[in-house]
From Swiss-Prot:
The gene is SED2. Secreted tripeptidyl-peptidase which degrades proteins at acidic pHs and is involved in virulence. One of its GO terms (biological process) is proteolysis. This is Tripeptidyl-peptidase SED2. Its EC number is 3.4.14.10.
Length: 596
């Protein structure tokens, strides 16, 4: 996970703004480039960039009121999820707002055929030279010394004052952050003779050393239950960073661990040029982990692997980086694709095992994408995210130029409209796994649905870690599942994988099972889960009171760079909600009794 430690840059550019720029207003400004990123040259003026412009809603509370109305048990609209057309009507800006923005673009040199009005978003393509004139900025090529990735970016951009109140953000401009699979980097071939192991050895008792579907079924009370094949209970799995789910590996996995599911498969949703190449040399561990446990735990459900392009090959000529590598923003591509699907094609559950430190992303970007998760929630999608694998933090310092010691919340796990999944390990007792991320958002205030649970934890915590986190921020994770040493087939071999990236798909499959249970009784799918979990559903989870997370060791676990050290930094598992396992792990039978 890249950490932003800022270094000063482009001060002379800021000081040399022409007076004609005074009619413009700055939308976003970074003091300097992120840690590990350095400027390597000016951007090619002819390079074409595809931009996303998010229109600021005149009444942002309307979306939030709607998602809580359809997601909070007891309210009159509970379960009455919106159709896509109803959501479009809710979000559509005034005609004059869109026309004003489009007029600015065309008058500034953007060709009309390069503009696409999508209601609350406007997409436009133009070259760097035109973009610089439009946004009163200068684009440069920045290189990340850790990954060798290069991107065309800027540190500040502006729009005319006359439309500034309508522009929430334009990207890619100031977005340097890079998604990472939420695994704890424990990837090792399993030496156990799997063929010689009996079915009993794959049971809950063996979760101590190896997690399989049989282990999870017994531990979480699923038994032999499978979902029914129906169009209104689909599961989506997010794929990024050229991770491709392999059909052959899934078949090997099912043959060994879920023989009754052999022959079941998944479909593909390829977004913005995304692929799902079979048999290639690239990494497939994360994708295989996700698909094998989602299909294995709910094999009759319709499962789709949504593969979104967003990072191409390395660029040999850094002054002219490859467009596909540097300027395609995969979260926005995926989310905009999903919210435009007809309701009968939407997944009821979406599992994603990727994230980044919250502070490494522009504030406008986290707000805009979090709102897109809320939009999915209004249409009945349970959005599941892994909480991360850095405990309270990895670098444990701010990126505002002050380098202050601070815990690092993870996004999108910190968005209040997703359900964040922490990690556990072992049985009898099941306990928090040390890498499970959690904490409190520095961007999003604590939602009301969390108040009672989180205030109770903060009272127990007292002054410990005071000043290192925001006690009024959205707290995460919400719940947890096993996260250590999952048996996964990858490239034909068994591998052990650890991380909350494993916890998320396991939980997604269990939520799909709960949806199946409700649909069989004539009730709608659960949709956005958190208001139910925090009001009543928590009693269907097993409270985890042993173990805790750890972090802030003095070195960033991804870059290896020296960082802040906080002795004994940890969130402990406690009675009730805590920021390492949330309310705990699922008990399927108990959950069926507290469903709305």
């Amino acid at each position: 996970m890249l950490v932003l430690k800022f270094v000063c840059l482009l001060a002379s550019v800021a000081a040399a703004k022409p007076t004609s720029w005074s009619s413009h207003k700055v939308v976003e400004h970074l003091e300097s480039a992120p840690e590990g990123w350095r400027i390597v040259g000016a951007a090619d003026p002819a390079a074409v960039i595809d931009f996303w412009l998010a229109i600021e809603r005149e009444n942002p509370e309307q979306l939030y009121d709607t998602i809580y109305d359809v997601s909070t048990p007891g309210r009159a609209r509970y379960g009455k999820h919106l159709k896509r057309e109803e959501l479009d009507d809710l979000l559509r800006p005034r005609v004059e707002t869109s026309e004003g923005i489009i007029s600015w673009l065309t008058n500034g040199g953007v060709k009309p055929q390069g503009i696409r009005d999508e209601g609350d978003w406007i997409r436009f393509s133009t070259d760097v030279k035109t973009a610089e004139q439009l946004m009163k900025t200068q684009f440069h090529v920045f290189k990340d010394d850790v990954s060798s990735v290069s991107r065309i970016r800027t540190l500040e951009y502006s729009v005319p004052a006359s439309i500034s109140s309508h522009v929430q953000m334009i990207q890619p401009t100031t977005l340097f952050g890079r998604q990472k699979p939420q695994n704890s980097l424990i990837l090792s071939p399993l030496t156990t003779d799997l063929e010689a192991m009996s079915e009993e050895e794959f049971s809950a008792s063996n979760c101590r050393s190896l997690v399989t579907t049989a282990c999870l079924r017994e531990l979480y009370g699923l038994g032999d239950r499978v979902t029914q094949a129906r169009d209104d209970n689909r599961i989506g799995v997010s794929g990024f960073l050229e991770e491709y789910a392999q059909y052959r590996d899934l078949d090997l996995f099912l043959s060994r661990f879920e023989p009754s599911a052999k022959g079941f498969n998944f479909s593909e949703g390829l977004i913005a040029g995304g692929k799902n190449t079979q048999g290639g040399p690239g990494s497939s561990t994360e994708a295989n982990l996700d698909m094998q446990y989602v299909v294995g735990l709910s094999h009759k459900a319709k499962v789709t692997y949504y593969s979104t392009a967003g990072r191409g090959p390395l660029i040999p000529d850094l002054s002219q980086p490859d467009q596909a590598s540097n300027d395609n923003e995969p979260y926005l591509e995926q989310l905009r694709y999903l919210v435009k699907l007809p309701k009968n094609q939407l997944p009821s559950v979406l599992s994603t095992s990727y994230g980044d430190t919250e502070q490494s992303l522009p504030a406008s970007y986290t707000k805009a994408t979090c709102d897109l998760f809320a939009q999915l929630g209004t249409m009945g999608v349970s959005v599941i995210f892994s909480s991360g694998d850095t405990g309270p933090g990895s670098s444990c310092q701010t990126n505002d130029g002050k380098n202050s010691t601070r815990f690092n919340p993870i996004y999108p796990a910190s968005c209040p409209f997703v359900t964040s999944i922490g990690g556990t390990v072992g049985t009898e007792p099941e306990r928090a796994v040390s890498f499970s991320s959690g904490g409190f958002s520095d961007r999003f205030p604590r939602p009301q649905y969390q108040d009672n649970a989180v205030k109770g934890y903060l009272k127990i915590l007292g002054n410990q870690w005071s000043g290192l986190f925001n006690p009024n921020g959205r707290a995460f994770p919400d719940i947890a599942a096993q996260g250590s040493n999952y048996a996964v087939y990858d490239k034909g071999r068994m591998t052990g994988v650890s991380g909350t990236s494993a916890s998320a798909p396991a939980m997604a499959a269990i939520i799909a099972q709960l949806n199946d249970f409700r649909l069989a009784k004539g009730s709608p799918v659960l949709g956005f889960l958190n208001p139910w979990i925090y009001s009543k559903g928590f009693s269907g989870f097993t409270d985890i009171v042993d173990g805790g997370s750890r972090g802030c060791t003095g070195y960033d676990i991804y870059s290896g760079l020296k960082a802040k050290r906080v002795p004994y930094a940890s969130w402990n598992a406690t009675k009730g909600w805590d920021p390492v396992t949330g309310f705990g792990t699922p008990n399927f039978q108990a959950l069926t009794k507290v469903l709305p």
